A protein has these predicted regions:
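Bacterial N-terminal signal peptides that target proteins for export
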Residues: 1-9
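Functional-site microenvironments in short loops/helix caps that host divalent-cation chemistry
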Residues: 132-261, 270-272
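Surface-exposed, flexible coil segments in extracellular/virion-facing regions
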Residues: 121-125
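Sec/Tat signal peptide C-region and signal peptidase I cleavage site
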Residues: 18-24
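A short glycine-rich, aromatic-capped structural motif
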Residues: 69-120, 134-136, 212-213
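Bacterial N-terminal signal peptides
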Residues: 8-17
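Short, structured beta-strand segments at or near domain termini in extracellular proteins/domains
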Residues: 271-280
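Alpha-helical segments with a strong preference for the paired helices of cellulosomal dockerin domains
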Residues: 25-26, 32-59, 112, 136-143
Length: 280
C-alpha cells in the first residue's frame, strides 16, 4: 500500500516542485490542461509526456489576425522571425524576419468570395481547400484580394513555408507538421480519397493546420537546387521554368508529406490535389 501511495504521489510532487517547460516556452506548475485546478488528469498528462515526449495538449496561443473579404473571414498567424536549417545536411542556413501565414489553406468559400468562381474539382463542403488552381491563378486571386482588403497578401516563400510548417521557434523537429504520427495531422492516401474540410486534423506547434496533406501548396519561389551558406529572407532563384510546391496531399503517400519534401511544376499547371495558403 505504501509503494502504491508513493507512486501516485511522486508525479504530483514533481509537478508542484519543479516547473515544466512546454514547447511554447511557458512554465506550468501542475495545471497542464489549464482548467484552473491540479487534478489526476494533469498527473496523467505528465506521465504521458514523460513516456512519449509529446505534449498532450497545445498550451501555445497563436497570435491570430482575422481578415474579411466580401463577408468571408480568414485567419493569419504571426510567425516570429528566427533561424533554421532548410536542408538536412546543414549546408543551407536561413534567417527570416517576422511574417504571417494562413492558419489554413485557402478555402473554396474564400476563393468564391474573391473571384466569383469555383474551379475546384471536388465540390461539397465549402471549407475544403480550393484546388485546380495554377500558380498564375493564385497571383490573380491575390491581386483581387489585396484590392478588396488594402493589404499586401502574397504566396509564402519556400523558406517561410518550411519554417512555419516545422513549428518556427517552437519546433519539435517532427517529420510531419505537428507530429511524428502523420494520421494525427494530415489527410493523405491512407485516410482520404479526396480533399477534406480544413482544420479537421490537429495543428502544429504554431496552431497552423494542414501543412502536410490535404493539398500541396504553391510557394512563391522558382525551383532550383538549394544553395550553400547562410541567407536572410531568401526568395529563391531569380528565374526558372517551374515553381515550388510543398506539403503533400490527400493523393500522396506519407513519404511525400514530410516537411522537407519539395516538388515543382510549371506555373500554369492545375491539378485537384494542389492549392495554396497566404502569407503577409
Amino acid at each position: 500500500m505504501k509503494k502504491c501511495t508513493l507512486f501516485l504521489f511522486l508525479p504530483v510532487f514533481l509537478m508542484l516542485a519543479f516547473p515544466i517547460k512546454t514547447f511554447a516556452g511557458d512554465y506550468l506548475r501542475g495545471d497542464n490542461n489549464e482548467d484552473g485546478t491540479v487534478s489526476i488528469a494533469d498527473v496523467t498528462s505528465l506521465i504521458d509526456y514523460l513516456l512519449s515526449n509529446e505534449w498532450p495538449n497545445n498550451p501555445f496561443k497563436p497570435e491570430v489576425t482575422t481578415f474579411t473579404a466580401n463577408g468571408v473571414s480568414f485567419n493569419m498567424v504571426k510567425i516570429e522571425g528566427g533561424t533554421f536549417w532548410m536542408d538536412h545536411s546543414d549546408n543551407y542556413k536561413v534567417s527570416l524576419s517576422t511574417y504571417s501565414i494562413g492558419q489554413t489553406e485557402v478555402t473554396r468559400m474564400l476563393w468564391y468570395a474573391v473571384m466569383g468562381t469555383d474551379p475546384s474539382g471536388f465540390k461539397g463542403d465549402l471549407t475544403r481547400p480550393v484546388e485546380m488552381v495554377s500558380w498564375d491563378d493564385c497571383q490573380q486571386f491575390i491581386t483581387k484580394l489585396n484590392s478588396l482588403t488594402g493589404q499586401h497578401f502574397r504566396l509564402p516563400t519556400e523558406a517561410e513555408w518550411a519554417f512555419a510548417a516545422c513549428g518556427g521557434n517552437l519546433s519539435h523537429n517532427y517529420v510531419y507538421a505537428g507530429s511524428e504520427d502523420i494520421s494525427i495531422v494530415a489527410w493523405y492516401e491512407e485516410n482520404a480519397n479526396e480533399t477534406q474540410p480544413v482544420a479537421t486534423k490537429a495543428p502544429n506547434e504554431l496552431g497552423i493546420y494542414d501543412m502536410c496533406g490535404n493539398v500541396w501548396e504553391w510557394c512563391q519561389d522558382w525551383y532550383g537546387e538549394y544553395p550553400s551558406g547562410t541567407y536572410t529572407n531568401p526568395q529563391g532563384p531569380e528565374t526558372g521554368t517551374s515553381r515550388v510546391f510543398k506539403g503533400g496531399s490527400w493523393h500522396s503517400p506519407a513519404s511525400n508529406c514530410t516537411i522537407g519534401t519539395r516538388s515543382h511544376t510549371g506555373p500554369e499547371n492545375q491539378v485537384n490535389h494542389r492549392g495554396f495558403r497566404l502569407a503577409l
